[in-house]
Amino acid sequence: MTSGAGWEEQVFLPITNSISSEDNNQIKIGSSVSIEYNQNGQHVSQIDDKGLHNILVLTGYAIDESTGELVPTFDPCDYVKGILISGKILKGNHFKIIGIPSNKLYIIRKKDVHGNITFSLPIKNFNTGTYQVDLRDKVTSFVSLDRDVAKTIVDNVLAKIYAKIYNSLNKEQKDKLYRDVEEIFNYYSIKSLKSNP
């Protein structure tokens, strides 16, 4: 944490089937979102020898897996889980939340989170200055990560974001991290009921 006042600016990185690592400290989500992370930054979400901590759950949202953008559904049962990392959104629209008290966020596996947090969300497109979401002919569905996807996310994404800590983990601790990702991360995906959305 920085100077007791709050965290440096964070980005919400949804952990989904459509996430992949790029060169130059970048993560790609679907076709429309690219996030640059600060490898030496102070991430709200952390890993250690006991696993993954400070996972943010955004309720009332689903993810468009083709684009990687979050879509507000206004359904309290829909949610997307992800991590808060030091970085910025390079490609895609974003919505910035400034200085929200950490105790107002739905954070699971909480560890050492205090103060205010400013973060950005990769969100569905804006139209001419007005935020508009068309939920007609759309349906959300529950998605969980399988073991192979969880392993790929740990090896190709988390291992790069948290390189110093990850490289110090032994095999048993890395196996725990694989299990954490597989068991913790699930989400709702939004799709069109029409064949050509």
Curated annotation (Swiss-Prot):
It holds the Pfam family Cmr7A. The keyword Transferase does not apply. Its main location: cytoplasm. It is found in: Cytoplasm. This is CRISPR system CMR subunit Cmr7 1. GO terms for biological process: CRISPR-cas system; defense response to virus. GO terms for cellular component: cytoplasm. Keywords: Antiviral defense, Cytoplasm. Possible homodimer. Part of the CMR ribonucleoprotein complex, consisting of crRNA plus Cmr1/Cmr2/Cmr3/Cmr4/Cmr5/Cmr6 at 1:1 and possibly 3 Cmr7 dimers. A Cmr2/Cmr3/Cmr7 subcomplex without crRNA can also be isolated. It does not cleave target RNA. Belongs to the CRISPR system Cmr7 family. The lineage of its organism: Archaea, Thermoproteota, Thermoprotei, Sulfolobales, Sulfolobaceae. InterPro entries: Cmr7A, CRISPR_Cmr7_comp. Transmembrane segments: none annotated. It comes from Saccharolobus solfataricus (strain ATCC 35092 / DSM 1617 / JCM 11322 / P2). The keyword Lyase does not apply. CRISPR (clustered regularly interspaced short palindromic repeat) is an adaptive immune system that provides protection against mobile genetic elements (viruses, transposable elements and conjugative plasmids). CRISPR clusters contain spacers, sequences complementary to antecedent mobile elements, and target invading nucleic acids. CRISPR clusters are transcribed and processed into CRISPR RNA (crRNA). The CMR complex degrades RNA complementary to the crRNA (target RNA) within UA dinucleotides, generating 3'-OH and 5'-phosphate ends.
